Each structure stands twice: as C-alpha cells, then as structure tokens.
Amino acid sequence: MKKVLIATMLFSGCFAIAQGPDLQKDYTAIEGKVVEWRRDIHQNPELGNREFKTAEKIAKHLESLGIEVKTGVAYTGVVGLLKGEQPGKVVALRADIDALPVPERNDLPYKSTVMGEFMGNEVPVMHACGHDTHTAILMGVAEVLAKNKNKIKGTIKFIFQPSEEGPP
C-alpha cells in the first residue's frame, strides 16, 4: 500500500515533496489507516448518486486535516482544497466513490452484504472495480500532503467523484 501512495504522489505533480526520509515515515504511519478505510468502504458500498455515507466519511476526514471542503458536488461528490504555503500551480487528484449492482462472491471478512435499488429491483451492491481502493488511497494522500502543507508549492484539489459508473 505504501508503494501505491508514493506512486500516486509521484504521478500527481507532487514530485517535489513525494520523496525523502521524512515522508517515508508519513507513508508508513498511515498505511494501516488506508487499509482500514478501504475495507470499511468496501463493506459499505453505495450506488452512484447515493454515496451519502461515503461522502460524509470523506468530508469529515478532509475537514479533520484542515482542508477546505465542498460537499454536494454533482449531488454526492466531495472536493477538498489544500492550499500550499508557497505559490504555484493547481493540481487535481481524483478518486471515484460509487459501487456497482453486483453480488460479491468471496468470503472476505469485510465482504459487502449491502443491498440497493437498481432499476426498480433490490440488488446486491459491491465495489467490483477498485473505487474503494481509489478512495482510501486518495484519503491517505490528502493526509500526508496536509501534514506537509509547508512544503507544497501551489494548490491541490482532491476530487471524490460520484456516479462514475453512471446513475443507477
């Protein structure tokens, strides 16, 4: 997971602060949280335009980091704005937060048992294509970057996109 966090920052335009021994400690310190968030989001999936609990979790986390938060973007989306302490460009990082009307067929302890309405039918819902992981990683990247705000040149937008798979 740490390698994914580092890669996300490297490819996001945050290269200048993505390296160094101090940040390695930050990545390592947050790794367990990211895994926990991913499992919680996986176990509690929400279909597109219904990601109310997911959006609330994201917004609370970003606010706890001192990141400016806008909710209700595209109905259930969340955007966080982290202004670095030095002038510079704006970089956007994005994660999709919706799940799919698909049954989960495994025995993981954090398996989804959530049901939702899709096209008038009650259906099983799960994160079948990684949106839970994308969301958890971006929450982790936000935490590391907020902690290192003094090293950031410019502004970072954290975009948590709802209904990427299309409305149910």
Spans of model-derived segments:
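Residue-level micro-sites within transmembrane alpha helices that shape
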Residues: M1-K2, G130-T133
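Bacterial Sec-dependent N-terminal signal peptides
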Residues: M1-P21
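Intrinsically disordered, low-complexity segments enriched in glycine/proline and serine/threonine
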Residues: L5-I6, P124, P168
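Phenylalanine-focused residue identity feature
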Residues: F11, F15, F52, F118, ...
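Surface-exposed, flexible loop/turn segments at secondary-structure boundaries
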Residues: S12, A99, E164-G166
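Acidic/His- and Gly-rich active-site-bordering loop/insert found
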Residues: Q19-M126, T133-G154
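Structural motif
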Residues: G72, C129, I159-Q161
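Fold-level recognition of mixed alpha/beta catalytic cores in primary-metabolism enzymes, strongest
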Residues: N150-P168
